[in-house]
A protein has these predicted regions:
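Conserved structural scaffold segments of CAZyme catalytic domains across common CAZy folds
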Residues: 1-101
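Aromatic- and carboxylate-enriched substrate-binding clefts and catalytic-loop regions
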Residues: 73-174
């Protein structure tokens, strides 16, 4: 078992990468508000889904060398239907600029249905804003349509230099 971590069989058997340029991919750690339900204590602002809370997380990430902050469910008005209607408590352009100054990237949570509906437009729009990736959730099945979605989402996200965290997805067993 101790040799499992050193096993290079996947690299030896996998097809070569289809991506020519991977220089934009920056793996890293993530600060994530979902674990504590935005419940920050001892601050001089009302914690919740708002700029002040996310700026607090960005500051924390910057101080501790954490590369990303995820804005989990709640940043958009209706995440099942539309990823372009942001709640009024969040100014995403301001947050993205603030995070950039602190050398922290932002990743947005997105429900599968809303992301799949217009993923090309979603990826283009948020990439241009400076977002670094998406955490896509609630795929919850493993049929061919869903497998195809994963490939399509990865391809389109890569086109716009966005990383993807497939969350709530099937186990890739082959």
């Amino acid at each position: 078992d101790k040799e499992l971590a050193d096993n290079d069989m996947v690299y030896k058997l996998a097809a070569p990468s289809r991506m020519k340029d991977i220089s934009w991919i920056r793996p890293g750690k993530v600060a994530w508000e979902w674990w504590n339900h935005w419940g920050i204590k001892g601050v001089d602002f009302e914690a919740g889904i708002n700029n002040e809370t996310y700026m607090h997380y960005i500051d924390f990430a910057s101080r501790h060398g954490i590369e990303y902050v995820i804005l989990d469910e709640g940043w958009a008005v209706n995440l099942k239907a539309d990823l372009f209607q942001i709640v009024p408590e969040i100014d995403l352009k301001k947050l993205t600029a603030y995070a950039r100054q602190k050398n922290v990237g932002l990743i947005l949570w997105a429900g599968y249905h809303a992301f799949a509906r217009d993923m090309e437009h979603v990826c283009k729009h948020y990439s241009e804003m400076g977002i670094k990736g998406f955490k896509i959730d609630f795929m919850d099945r493993d049929d061919q349509e869903m497998v195809d979605f994963h490939y399509r989402a990865a391809e389109i996200a890569a086109k716009y230099k966005l990383m993807v965290d497939f969350h709530g997805t099937y186990k890739p067993t082959g």
